[in-house]
């Protein structure tokens, strides 16, 4: 609950919003309490910029000491005291006034007015008013202790925790799962004060940003506990862990973990353990089994006292495993509880030494607020003191002590979050309500000031100034400029007229005065705008508050001069000075303050600030004087040096000095030359030992060089050999790859063929059966045809036999005719005469004279030639049924030599041929007659007879006989060893073709070339 400002300023309130004890109480402390706390006891300090003005903590409506004073004061605007108290009880932001919150604005960019008027009597007048303010503050200090105690809620963490645990154990499973889910989701929310950049950093393994574990730590702990949960825990242990999660939720919501001892934790865990011992069969079996195995109790004793347990507590069935949703939530809650315990233990190890005895330290106050050092002003400041960030005086001893105790911003934020996490549930709700209300008031104030934009005096047109209005026009590092409207009313018409006529003194024409941090500010100047008229102008008064310290928070209170009533209070923070040289000797403080100081502290800060400025200017002046003195002395020295050189130096002296310098240089050069010549002489004579050593080293070098060259040659040869091997292997590899590719292509083709064959076979199963049926039908037809052909062959064989008999008779007749012709030819040859009177022609050789051969040889037929008349017949194969062969057949079965004519050609000369003819000589000796056939016209050519002789004309009898044969076979040929004579008149189809039949009851056919039948007996 918020306290009154007067009470806070006097008593240094010792309670915060959570009911915990505050920091140490400083005796006779006159500064404002909660210097670094937020408004209304909030935990987060509000940062106020230089362009934004905030009001201090307002007085509560329960402040009984303020009500009489407010009732006694006069009301210029006709507003009741209760409404003023209500307005004063609310928190005023952005310069809202006490009387009318809608008429209060803050202007930071307005132009400040010139300070006009005479201010000679202001100091004495405000000194008289200070006594009245002191009396009012004394009267406000009287507050009822019972009323103050009734506003504080007592903290009972043990009772709250046990009550919440009992409530959670009675909830149904669905609602309990929802509660656990909401509680688990709170662990993933970033704490207050955590930035986006700090969420990605890890302070250490258990301590994350802003006092919370990092996301990676939470995930790792959840995974580790989930692994233990799934692998190493029984069913009864999982159910027990679920209830332990309820204990963690109850301890967190009830604030049971904020105590120094673990009594609440032990009590809650004991309650859950006793319940499970009574109701869980698994735990009973587990505990009893261990007790019996360790011989702590005997089975008889256990059976004796087991009947005392009520029947409803005896569970016969085992508990089922919890659902995976509740298991995940319980694992997460227990894992974060273990992480919190580890972080607390580490925080204890990291915490500084405990404070000295007799001092009480508030954890939250030390984490969220700055150490108060205002007591340094009360005890007196030394000469070596300097200003703090808010204008406070800090001695070296106090600064060293405070610097040791101050924490970094991150560590303080972490500690504040740790303290906030230990707050009970009702305290968190109260803090949330206060924060929401504060933000609501702040947003409403911003909306009324045009979304926080800086306002000018032109923006205040149409605003009522009946109750008076004060606003800030400019805020500087050491000054605050403000403007005010008209404060005169109907009741003060006489006073207003006197002010306008100038009949009153300078002290009485100022309707208000300024107090800074509760102290009457003597350096505040207020001047009236001369051109402003009543009701027609907006700005009637302008003023300036000077003598302030930069980067400090101030509360400027505007008080009425006649009634000492507070018109409004505005909180302003001066910006940092732009002068970089100012306060260069003062080291920067550890942490700036955003709350105003006490009146005494403010006055002392102002005095010290002015003295510091004066000292700074004096030090600058002294430093400038010293610098100027040093520069002047340096310039004078240089001037004296130049004058001395100018007056003392002549041409002769300069030439002498130059000659001496040259002589000195020449002497040094000669000495260096002599030294170098001595070194050269010593280097020309080489010692024998060094020469021998050099030769040995050179020989070793040459030997090593030869070894190196040989090694290089071996390396080159080895590289070439390896290169050849590599090239051969590469060629083998290439050939192998090509062969492999060919085999692969062949394999691909074979696979394709195989697939086609398989598909064809699969498709041709029915075709095969059809073909088998057709083949069977064809075989039957062929069997019928074969039987028919056999019958025909039998009839043909009989006809062939008949033809053979007839052919034999014809051959006999032919033999007789041929014999007669041969005889006639012989007689013609014997009786032949020369064809010319001169005798034989050259080149002719009569047969009677030149040839020693018998006459029968002339008519003989060589195997490859023809007879004279062409009546030689080829051999005719006889039928195998023929049993009687003639003498001609016998002689023809054994062919003779080509030179010797066969015996059947030696026929006796016919008597008809004895007569000579006039054609004999011409027939005999004419080489180119028709009868003189060329050997080249025959098939085989004449090899033994004289080719120049004219051969007798022969008749191709086999051709004549072949025309009569229907079958075209040569079965009727004569059985002779003569080769068939081919004639140009013979058909091509009759050459080398023949057929025969077997007379043994069978029939057959054959074919062959003429040469194949030669020399083969039948």
From Swiss-Prot:
Name of the gene encoding the protein in the UniProt record: acrB
Gly residues: compositionally biased ranges: 991-1007
TM region positions: 162-182, 217-237, 258-278
GO cellular component labels: membrane
Name of the protein in question: Probable ubiquitination network signaling protein acrB
Membrane protein topology class: Multi-pass membrane protein
Organism of origin: Aspergillus clavatus (strain ATCC 1007 / CBS 513.65 / DSM 816 / NCTC 3887 / NRRL 1 / QM 1276 / 107)
Biased composition (Low complexity): 45-74
Biased composition (Polar residues): 1-21
Alphabetically ordered keywords of this record: Coiled coil, Membrane, Transmembrane, Transmembrane helix, Ubl conjugation pathway
Residue ranges, annotated region (Disordered): 1-138, 342-371, 581-602, 962-1018
Family, as annotated: Belongs to the acrB family.
Keyword hit for Secreted: no
Presence of keyword Coiled coil: yes
Subcellular location(s) per record: Membrane
Compositional bias ranges of the Basic and acidic residues kind: 82-93
Origin superkingdom: Eukaryota
């Amino acid at each position: 609950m918020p306290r009154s400002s007067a009470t806070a300023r006097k008593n240094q309130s010792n309670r915060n919003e959570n009911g915990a004890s505050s920091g140490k109480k400083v005796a006779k402390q006159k500064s404002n309490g909660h210097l670094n706390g937020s408004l209304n006891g909030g935990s987060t300090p509000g940062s106020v910029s230089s362009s934004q003005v905030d009001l201090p903590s307002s007085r509560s409506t329960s402040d009984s000491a303020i009500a009489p004073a407010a009732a006694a004061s006069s009301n210029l605007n006709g507003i009741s005291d209760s409404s003023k108290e209500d307005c004063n009880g609310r928190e005023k932001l952005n310069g809202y006034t006490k009387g009318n919150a809608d008429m209060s604005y803050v202007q930071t960019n307005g132009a400040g007015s010139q300070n006009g008027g005479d201010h000679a009597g202001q100091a004495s007048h405000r000194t008289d008013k200070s006594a009245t303010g002191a009396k009012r503050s004394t009267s406000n200090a009287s507050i009822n202790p019972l009323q103050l105690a009734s506003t504080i809620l007592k903290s009972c963490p043990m009772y709250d925790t046990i009550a919440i645990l009992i409530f959670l154990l009675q909830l149904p499973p669905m609602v309990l799962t929802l509660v656990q889910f909401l509680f688990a989701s709170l662990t993933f929310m970033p704490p207050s004060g955590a930035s986006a950049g700090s969420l990605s950093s890890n302070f250490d393994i258990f301590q994350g940003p802003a006092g919370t574990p990092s996301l990676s730590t939470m995930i790792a702990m959840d995974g580790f506990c989930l692994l233990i949960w799934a692998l190493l825990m029984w069913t009864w242990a999982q159910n027990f862990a679920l209830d332990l999660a309820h204990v963690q939720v109850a301890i967190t919501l009830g604030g049971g973990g904020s105590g120094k001892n673990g009594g609440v934790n032990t009590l809650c865990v004991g309650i859950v353990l006793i319940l499970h011992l009574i109701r869980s069969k698994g735990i009973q079996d587990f505990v009893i089994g261990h007790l019996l195995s360790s011989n702590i109790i005997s089975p008889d004793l256990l059976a004796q006292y087991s009947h005392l347990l009520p029947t409803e507590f005896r569970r016969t069935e085992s508990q089922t495993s919890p659902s995976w949703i509740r298991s995940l939530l319980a694992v997460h809650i227990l894992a974060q509880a273990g992480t919190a315990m580890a972080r607390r233990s580490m925080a204890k190890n990291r915490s500084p030494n405990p404070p000295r005895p007799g001092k009480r330290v508030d954890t939250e106050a030390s984490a969220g607020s700055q150490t108060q050092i205002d007591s340094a002003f009360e005890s007196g400041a030394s000469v070596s003191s300097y200003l703090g960030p808010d204008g406070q005086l800090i001695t070296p001893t106090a600064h060293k002590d405070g610097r040791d105790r101050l924490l970094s911003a991150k560590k303080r934020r972490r500690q504040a979050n740790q303290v906030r996490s230990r707050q009970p549930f009702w305290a968190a709700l109260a803090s949330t309500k206060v924060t929401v209300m504060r933000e609501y008031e702040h947003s409403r104030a911003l909306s009324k000031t045009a979304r926080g934009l800086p306002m000018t005096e032109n923006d205040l047109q149409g605003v009522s100034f009946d109750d008076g209005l004060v606003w800030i026009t400019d805020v500087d590092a050491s000054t605050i400029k403000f403007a005010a409207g008209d404060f005169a009313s109907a009741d003060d018409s006489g006073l207003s007229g006197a002010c306008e006529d100038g009949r009153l003194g300078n002290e009485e024409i100022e309707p208000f005065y300024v107090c800074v941090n509760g102290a009457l500010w003597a350096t505040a100047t207020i001047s009236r705008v001369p051109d402003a008229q009543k009701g027609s102008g907006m700005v009637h008064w302008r003023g300036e508050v000077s003598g302030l310290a930069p980067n400090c928070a101030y509360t400027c209170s505007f008080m009425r001069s006649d009634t000492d009533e507070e018109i409004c209070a505005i909180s302003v923070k001066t910006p940092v000075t732009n002068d970089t040289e100012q306060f260069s000797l003062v080291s920067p403080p550890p942490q700036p303050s955003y709350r105003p100081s006490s009146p005494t502290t403010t006055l002392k800060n102002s005095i010290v600030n002015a003295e510091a400025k004066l000292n700074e200017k004096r030090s600058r002046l002294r430093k400038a004087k010293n610098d100027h003195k040093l520069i002047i002395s340096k310039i004078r020295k240089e001037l004296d040096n130049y004058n001395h050189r100018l007056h003392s130096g002549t041409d002769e002296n300069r030439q002498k000095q130059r000659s001496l310098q040259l002589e000195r240089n020449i002497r040094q050069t000669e000495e260096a030359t002599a030294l170098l010549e001595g070194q050269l002489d010593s280097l020309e004579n080489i010692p024998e030992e060094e020469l021998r050593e050099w030769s040995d080293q050179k020989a070793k070098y040459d030997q090593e060089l030869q070894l190196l060259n040989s090694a290089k040659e071996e390396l080159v040869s080895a590289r070439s050999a390896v290169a050849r091997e590599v090239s051969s292997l590469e060629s083998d590899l290439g050939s192998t790859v090509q062969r492999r590719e060919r085999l692969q292509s062949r394999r691909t083709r074979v696979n394709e063929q195989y697939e086609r064959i398989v598909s064809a076979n699969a498709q041709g199963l029915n075709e095969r059966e059809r073909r088998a049926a057709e083949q069977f039908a064809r075989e039957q037809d062929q069997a019928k045809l074969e039987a028919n052909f056999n019958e025909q062959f039998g009839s043909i064989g009989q006809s062939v036999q008949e033809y053979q008999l007839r052919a034999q008779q014809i051959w006999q007749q032919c033999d007789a005719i041929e014999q007669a012709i041969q005889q006639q030819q012989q007689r013609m040859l014997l009786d032949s005469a020369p064809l010319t009177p001169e005798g034989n022609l050259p080149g002719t050789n009569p047969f009677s004279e030149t040839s020693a051969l018998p006459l029968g040889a002339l008519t003989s037929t060589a195997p490859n030639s023809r007879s004279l008349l062409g009546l030689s017949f080829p051999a005719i194969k006889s039928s195998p049924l023929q049993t009687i062969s003639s003498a001609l057949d016998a002689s023809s079965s054994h062919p003779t030599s080509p030179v010797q004519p066969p015996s059947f050609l030696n026929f006796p000369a016919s008597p008809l041929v004895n007569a000579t003819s006039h054609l004999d000589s011409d027939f005999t000796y004419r080489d180119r007659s028709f009868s003189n056939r060329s050997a080249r016209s025959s098939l085989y050519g004449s090899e033994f007879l004289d080719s120049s002789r004219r051969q007798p004309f022969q008749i191709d009898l086999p051709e004549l006989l072949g025309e009569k044969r229907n079958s075209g076979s040569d079965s009727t040929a004569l059985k002779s060893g003569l080769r068939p004579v081919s004639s140009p008149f013979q058909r091509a189809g009759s050459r080398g073709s023949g057929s025969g039949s077997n007379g043994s009851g069978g029939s057959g056919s054959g074919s062959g070339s003429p040469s194949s039948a030669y020399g083969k007996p039948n």
